[in-house]
């Protein structure tokens, strides 16, 4: 078995044509603000930027082919502007993260990670940190199951649309 990073469905198909081992992982950038994988499915038939399919329906493809998506840069803003946690660019999202974090008695980092883990695609998180406490906060997300309402509230608070 092996995995790839940032591959679209047709790239995966082409690669699988020439290798014997099954491809089981695709690493992609994914966070609450950087969630085009979800947006293009939510905004189908809408005249919005999120409706544009930039990845060839990668989320659906991976789910249909039992390929695990691994989210890299799970706390990153779009355009590599840094971490969205505590950023002035996402006041509504950070406020909502704080409210939900207080409910579960965890950090906003934990809730941001739990948001990724709550998606039915059973995504995994790839993160790097030199902070033991931050790593513990991320690991704590495995014990939190956000409600659907909380998941969508965070999605909307990041500026995404629903039909």
Locate the predicted segments by residue.
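Beta/alpha (TIM)-barrel catalytic core signal, keyed to glycine-rich beta->alpha loops juxtaposed to Asp/Glu
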Residues: 1-163
């Amino acid at each position: 078995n092996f995995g790839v990073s940032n591959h679209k469905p047709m790239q995966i198909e082409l690669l699988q044509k020439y290798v014997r081992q099954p491809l089981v992982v695709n690493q992609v950038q994914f966070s609450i603000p950087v969630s085009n994988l979800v947006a293009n499915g939510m905004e189908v038939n809408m005249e919005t930027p999120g409706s544009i399919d930039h990845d060839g329906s990668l989320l659906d493809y991976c789910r249909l082919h039992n390929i695990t998506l691994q989210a890299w840069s799970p706390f990153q803003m779009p355009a590599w502007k840094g971490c969205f946690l505590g950023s002035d660019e996402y006041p509504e999202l950070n406020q909502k993260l704080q409210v939900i974090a207080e409910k579960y008695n965890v950090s906003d980092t934990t809730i941001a990670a739990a948001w990724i883990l709550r998606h039915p695609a059973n995504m995994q998180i790839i993160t790097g940190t030199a902070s033991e406490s931050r790593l513990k906060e991320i690991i704590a997300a495995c014990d939190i199951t956000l409600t659907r309402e909380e998941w969508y509230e965070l999605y909307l608070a990041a500026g995404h649309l629903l039909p």
